[in-house]
Structures are given as C-alpha cells and as structure tokens.
C-alpha cells in the first residue's frame, strides 16, 4: 500500500518545509543556502500548517521572495515543535542537553533556528543549553525503536503482534462530526476519529 506523510499537520514540519521549497521550484538540498541568503523574513504565527500555508500566499502577495519566506518558515519551526505540538514553553525544565533528531536536521536553516530558539529559552537561567544534532538524525527514530525492542526482548517480553492475516481482518469505524472538531487553535479543524475492533 502507498503511504503518504501528512502534508498539513505541524507535526510533519520537515515535510512541510520540503513541500514549500519544491513548490517554489527548488530542491530541498538548496533550502538552507536560500534561507541564509535572505536579507529579511516575514514573521509567521506558529501553529497549524494549514494556516501557515495561507500565510505563505499572503506573504507572496505582499512581495516577499521565496528565500525570505523559507527563512521565515525555518525560523518558526521551533515554535511549532516546542510551543504548538509539545506545549513545553519552559525548555530548561527538560534539562540542559537537547539532541535534535529527524531528517529535518539535514536542513541547516532548521538547525540554526532550533539552536537559536533553545538558547533564547535559557537566556535568564544562568546556564547555557548543549544542543547536539544526532549523528544519524534521519534514522535516529528507527535506531531508538530497535534499541527499545532489544531491551524489552532481553527482559523476556515478546511481541503482541497479531499477524498479517489478522491485521487484514481488523474492522474499524470512523467518526467525523461536530463532536470531533478540534478547538486547539482558531482553525477549528474537523477531525476523523477511528475506532478499531480487533
């Protein structure tokens, strides 16, 4: 089966940056160089990528250039991650060391924005954060999952996977109505809830 990453949710920040870059006619590998070349950038509000997509259109109408818009998107990325998705405004409460992971960290504009944002959250804390980009940032999630499986297997825990034949027989119901509407931001998106019956 084909799987398509969600192109709208802010949890998919890397894909959003990539699709914006490609939409402007550039290869994603050019993103950082283009963003760093910008002399100014528009200020995006953080939150839902659907809303940010409409901001892109508005900024284009106002005359902002693609590289300036891409710089603005990279700049707002940490706010989406820490304030919108994770909802952790006090980063110092997590400790001093931050390891950035995920394929987005191949984009140096995104990395710089993360480092700057994290450092800004330590400004009056009397200490500085230690920000590290994982050596295998694009694969770090899979590496972590494999290490966790090995740890659990070593403790005698076995899989609860029901098998592919049983998976094909799973029944589910979807619900999409006013009761599933999200009020987390001003967009008030309609969500689909899926109830799985095994």
Language model features: what each stretch is:
Residues 4-12, 72-75, 99-105, 130-142:
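Active-site nucleophile and cofactor-binding loops and adjacent substrate-binding regions
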Residues 76, 89-121, 136-138:
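Glycine-rich phosphate-binding loops at beta-strand->alpha-helix junctions
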Residues 2-40, 147, 151, 196-197:
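Glycine-rich phosphate-binding loop plus the immediately following alpha-helix
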Residues 14-22, 132-164:
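Glycine-rich phosphate-binding/hydrolytic loop that grips phosphoryl groups
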Residues 2-7, 96, 120-134, 177-178:
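Short beta-alpha connecting loops at secondary-structure transitions
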Residues 54-84:
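Adenine-nucleotide phosphate-binding core of ATP-dependent small-molecule kinases
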Residues 148-198:
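Acidic, glycine/GT-rich loop-and beta-edge segments that sit at the periphery of enzyme/chaperone cores
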Residues 27-60, 75, 184-192:
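Conserved ATP-utilizing enzyme core subdomain
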């Amino acid at each position: 089966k084909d799987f398509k990453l969600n192109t709208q949710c802010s949890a998919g920040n890397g894909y959003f940056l990539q699709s914006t870059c490609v939409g402007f006619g550039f290869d994603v590998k050019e993103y950082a160089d283009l963003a760093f070349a910008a002399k100014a950038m528009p200020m995006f509000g953080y939150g839902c990528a659907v809303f940010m997509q409409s901001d892109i259109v508005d900024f284009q109408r106002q005359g902002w250039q693609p590289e300036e818009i891409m710089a603005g998107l990279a700049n707002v990325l940490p706010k989406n991650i820490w304030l919108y998705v994770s909802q952790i405004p006090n980063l110092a409460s997590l400790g001093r060391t931050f390891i950035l992971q995920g394929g987005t960290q191949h984009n140096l504009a995104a990395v710089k924005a993360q480092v700057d944002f994290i450092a800004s959250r330590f400004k009056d804390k009397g200490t500085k954060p230690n920000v590290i980009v994982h050596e295998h940032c694009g694969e770090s999630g899979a590496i972590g999952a494999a290490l966790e499986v090995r740890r659990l297997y070593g403790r005698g825990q076995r899989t609860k996977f029901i098998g592919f034949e049983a998976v094909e027989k799973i029944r589910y119901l979807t619900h999409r109505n006013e009761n599933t509407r999200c009020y987390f931001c001003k967009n008030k998106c309609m969500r689909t809830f899926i109830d799985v019956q095994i």
